[in-house]
Amino acid sequence: VLDSYLKNEIFLTENELKLSESNLVIMSSKEDMLMRESAAILKAENKIVLNVGFGLGIIDTYIRNHGPKEHHIIEAHPQVCEKAQEMGFEVHCGKWEEVITSFIETEKKFDAIYFDTYVFDYKTNPQWAPFTRLVPKLLSKGGTYSYFNNIAAKVEGVEGIVQEFGWKRSSKDLKHPFDSKPYTLVWFTKNT
């Protein structure tokens, strides 16, 4: 599925990121409030931050505005990667599995990690659990891990995996910008 997405041409505007072939919206500026709140909980000021999945760059713009010490972005889609670079971001272009390996090998640690990669079906996202299992190797003590969790929290096993680590779970209810259901922002703090 990921390889299919990476081969698709995308259409980028200021407000939307779509697959050209199907016109399917991957990300919309309607998510601005969710991304702003997510960036705020990461507490990026003078921190080393990793975001996996650039999209329109909404969360990364907010992270950058918080003044991180280092700001790492991983983006798999070549067109999105190019757009991120045009916007002045330094991006690790490639699949997260490939980039993360080099971080683990060099024992790179992050104070905050946010994970929001595109998949066709968030409920069965095969990426969340494998990525989440690697987070303890990447996250500094006292660090924060969060993800696009309105749907991700329902992905079988993701929250259970993090709870196995014994990390502190925090949440904040928000009004969802384009859905009548509330959005619960969830993040975890590594306390060991």
What are these regions, as identified by a protein language model?
Residues 123-191:
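C-terminal substrate-binding/active-site "lid" region of AdoMet-derived donor-dependent transferases
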Residues 102-117:
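A short acidic, Gly/Pro-enriched loop at the edge of an enzyme's catalytic core
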Residues 76-105:
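S-adenosyl-L-methionine
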Residues 56-68:
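Conserved SAM-binding loop of SAM-dependent methyltransferases across substrates and taxa
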